[in-house]
Amino acid sequence: MIEIDTRIHDRYSIELKVGFVTRKKLRMNDFSLAMWFFVPGSLDINRATYPKDMFYQDVKSNIRLITPVFLLREIVEGPALPLRNIREAFIQMASNPTRTLISEYEYQIKMFAAIVKSALRDELAHIKQNRIGSDTETLCDGFIRNAGKICDEYVGLRTIINAPTVPEGVMRMYLSGDEFICDITCKHILELIEWLRGRKLDELAGKATALYRRIGKHMRQLGYPEIRKDDRLHNRIFIHRFSILKKYIESDLYLRAPKRRDGVIVEQLYFSIAAGLAMLFATVVSFAFQKKFGSLTLPLFIALIISYMLKDRIKELMRYYFAHRVGSKYFDNKAKIIHKDTELGWLKEGVDFIEPEKVPADVMTLRNSSHLTEVESGNVTAEKIILYRKSVHIDRDKLQANSEYSFSGINDIIRLNVTNFIKKMDDPSVLMRTLDDDGSIQTVDCDRDYYLNLVLQYQYDNTAEFKRFRIDLSRDGIKSIEEVVG
């Protein structure tokens, strides 16, 4: 299964979180993803102005394991795996702080904090999407209670490692996890408070506020920074610190994927064939003229010059032909997906400009299914079409090896910076005039936007699915991303 989530990452970047979820009973899992970008022709994006190297500079891809899924109540109630694992790691490390046990202790801190972060996010999203009004109070009360219990349970672990056998640096690992859990819990509690107040659920908002203040008191006691009103310098440090903490906590989930060119051996083989055929042509011409006119004659001399001129052209033309064939069959880059020195699988990626007639009918039908104007429906051919494709292979057995947790797959977090797309846009606003009801002429400031259409074609287990998104852009950056239902 492939799960796709889109959002605006920043003013000039869109983010696609692509989850490649493996089947439990299938060892080898293969996925394919094609992203069709329909770019307005007025932006002057084409092969000459936007080569492959520039596209890959604009695209950033992070590969990471999908965080194991637990409910908040599962983390704090009964024999919960995350809490049990972290407690056992703390006890063993405190008794015998060897390098191996310290490494396991740090790993369990990171996993526990990452699992809590995902659980808070998912349950808050569920509360907001809940349509059964009578369940709202129970869901919110459970969220507040369980979030508070998780913080208390983690704080209680400190007594296990606050021992003379534990080095100071090891305690700092614990405190980093504590600070991150406090920060992320407060962030989601604030979001819940705002949501509750908007629905006049003041009693629940009061409970959430009490938890927020309790966590804040704990943070101040341990010297963790908090957001302060009218203190930009302090808040700058807070943002930087939180960003570093987030990277530290999630570092064990990220996978290495060193890239290299795909199809290099086949490409060189084709190029060698091209050189050989060109040389064969020159040799045949040389032998033919030598046989007819003899050696050291003027006709032979002229024939040799012409044959070598044509040989180089034939060689280049055949190199171009073979390169096109290799490019259509192979990808630009290939990377091994590696976690803790274990190769979990591989991924391939490729990008190219595609002519409209070569776009699959299903993709073009979805692109044409909804237009903002009638004129646009006949103007699709003026768009430039970029195809970015990925192929992913995952070995599920290796994915599950050497871990107490069950990982369902990997996330490929793709960020596309659109700075090169907006270089040739007109000003973001234009002054237009209209006649008011009283007959006066009014000047109105109007937005000038451009629309980038993205069609996703993803395939797994012989099943193909499609999604379309409309990205609203202006000279000032990205305004919105909306899914267009065909």
Task: Tell me what each language-model feature is.
Residues M1-F242:
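Soluble regions of membrane-associated proteins that transit the secretory/organelle pathway
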Residues I4-T6, I14-V18, L33-M35, E349-P356, ...:
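Hydrophobic transmembrane signal anchors and adjacent membrane-proximal interface regions, especially
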Residues F20-V21, D30-R73, V363-R475:
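Structured extramembrane domains adjacent to transmembrane segments
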Residues R131, K329, N333-D341, S370:
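A sequence-level detector of short, solvent-exposed, charge-rich linear segments
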Residues E194-L277, F281, R468-S474, I478:
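Membrane-proximal, non-transmembrane alpha-helical segments
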Residues V264-A335:
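Transmembrane alpha-helical hairpins and terminal membrane-anchor modules
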Residues K340-V380:
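Acidic, Ser/Thr-rich low-complexity segments on the non-lumenal side of membrane proteins
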Residues S480-G486:
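Acidic, serine/threonine- and proline-rich intrinsically disordered appendage/tail regions
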